[in-house]
Curated annotation (Swiss-Prot):
SMART domains hit by this protein: HLH (SM00353), ORANGE (SM00511)
Protein's recorded name: Hairy/enhancer-of-split related with YRPW motif protein
GO cellular component, one term: nucleus
Main location: nucleus
Feature: compositional bias, Low complexity: 272-297, 305-346
The keyword Transit peptide appears for this protein: no
Stretches with biased composition (Polar residues): 86-98
InterPro entries in the cross-refs: bHLH_dom (IPR011598), HES_HEY (IPR050370), HLH_DNA-bd_sf (IPR036638), Orange_dom (IPR003650)
Gene3D superfamilies: 6.10.250.980, Helix-loop-helix DNA-binding domain
Stretches for region Disordered: 26-109, 272-357
């Protein structure tokens, strides 16, 4: 019995090992129907092996259950982290920070999109081609950007010389435009206001002169259009062409006195004294202002006119000396009346004293004195308004001395008016 049990023990042990955990061995139940059966000592090894096998199986089962428990906890932890990212509960401390970060990110992104859209709308309004296409169809963002690039390229091609921009040239262009407008207004004034014919020689000469002048200014402006013609340090108030050569018509400098541009020849309706005053006044103005107005009246013409007038005055003086020999008492009375008058006449001759000393031309002044001498007859009073001529009847006095002037009117004779002789010159 013991031997059989001992022999059957390995088989039972082998069968029980192959059976797996939790399976009741049928041999054990068959041989030991009673639950209180005590195995023999020989079976101690098998029992020990069974116990060790069961313990190993239980240990392995415990390890498997432990591993399963750890894996399930890891999955639960991962799921909880993912769920916390998706569904943030306000009870957690880091949930508020995550929520605020998400909100800030959304607000920043919205602002960025709004800024891009507003800039594209502004470009669509500013670019001409995009503005023209705006009414026909809705423009996409890429199309707006493409039209903007094309517009910038066209601007760059048109303004390649933007670095060599010359403000002086622009000012000169405006000046030429204004000059042409003024010339057109002058032509209109001569026809409509002055009643001058369109084919009038004076009008034609004036317009041709203005056209030639503006052409010269345009040529001078083009000559100054070189890159080195303008420097930023040049003052803007010095004129349009500070660095350029003067045009041929720029020699007509503007006079300091605005009344210096007067007629270069005396009017025929003026008296000889007024003509001499006009000539002397123009010469003094031209010398004091330093302008080139006297070029229109050469110096030899002035000397020839003054010499001819001097000869005429000498003839007049000779005739008047013969007449004054008959009226000696009238000359004495007139001398007594005119001697206290140098201070009254001084302001007439003060302006032209320098010119008279240079040209040696006597100046004749028309005086209308209210205090007339009583000895002058009624016949001579009718000619008191006419210009009178001085007479150097006193010995030791020069006729060029303008401080003492003698005036006399012959009885019954008109004063000498050499209009024909002066018109011949």
């Amino acid at each position: 019995m013991d031997h059989n049990m001992h022999v059957n023990a390995p088989s039972l042990h082998h069968w029980g090992y192959a059976a797996g955990p939790g399976v009741v061995m049928p041999g054990a139940t068959a041989t030991t129907p009673q639950s209180h059966w005590v195995p023999p000592p020989q079976s101690h090894h098998s029992a020990h092996s069974n116990h060790s096998h069961g313990h190993s199986q239980g240990h392995s089962h415990g390890i498997g259950s432990l591993k399963r428990t750890l894996s399930e906890s890891d999955c639960d932890d991962l799921y909880s982290e993912e769920s916390s990212k998706e569904q943030i509960s306000p009870s957690e401390p880091g949930s508020c920070q995550l929520m605020s970060r998400k909100k800030r990110r959304g607000v920043i992104e919205k602002k960025r999109r709004d800024r891009i859209n507003s800039s594209l709308t502004e470009l669509k309004r500013l670019v001409p081609s995009a503005y023209e296409k705006q009414g026909s169809a809705k423009l996409e963002k890429a199309e707006i950007l493409q039209l903007t690039v094309e517009h910038l390229k066209s601007l760059q091609s048109k303004t390649l010389d933007s670095l060599s921009y010359d403000p002086q040239r622009v000012a000169m262009d405006y000046h030429i435009i204004g000059f042409r407008e003024c010339a057109a207004e002058v032509a209109r004034y001569l026809v409509t206001i002055e009643g001058m014919d369109i084919q009038d020689p004076l009008r034609l000469r004036l317009m041709s002169h203005l056209q030639y002048f503006v052409q010269q200014r345009e040529l001078s402006a083009k000559s100054c259009a070189s890159p080195g013609g303008w420097s930023p340090a040049a003052p803007s108030s010095s004129g349009y062409q500070p660095n350029c050569a003067a045009a041929p018509y720029q020699s007509y400098a503007a006079p300091a006195n605005p009344g210096a541009y007067v007629s270069s020849y005396p009017t025929l309706s003026a008296s000889p004294s007024q003509q001499a005053q006009q000539l002397g006044g123009r010469t003094s103005v031209s010398r004091t202002s330093g302008s080139a107005v006297t070029e229109s009246l050469p110096s030899h013409d002035l000397h020839s006119d003054s010499s001819s007038q001097q000869q005429q005055q000498q003839q007049q003086q000779q005739q008047q000396q013969q007449q004054h020999q008959q009226q000696q008492h009238q000359q004495q009375q007139q001398r007594t009346q005119t001697t206290p008058q140098p201070t009254q006449q001084q302001h007439y001759t003060h302006d032209h004293s320098a010119v008279h000393s240079e040209q040696q031309v006597p100046t004749y002044i028309e005086l209308t004195n209210s205090n007339r001498p009583a000895a002058i007859g009624s016949d001579s009073l009718s000619y008191s308004a006419a210009p009178q001529y001085p007479v150097s009847g006193l010995p030791g006095q020069d006729y060029n001395n303008s401080s003492v002037l003698q005036y006399a009117t012959p009885n019954g004779a008109k004063p000498y008016r050499p209009w024909g002789a002066e018109m011949a010159y």
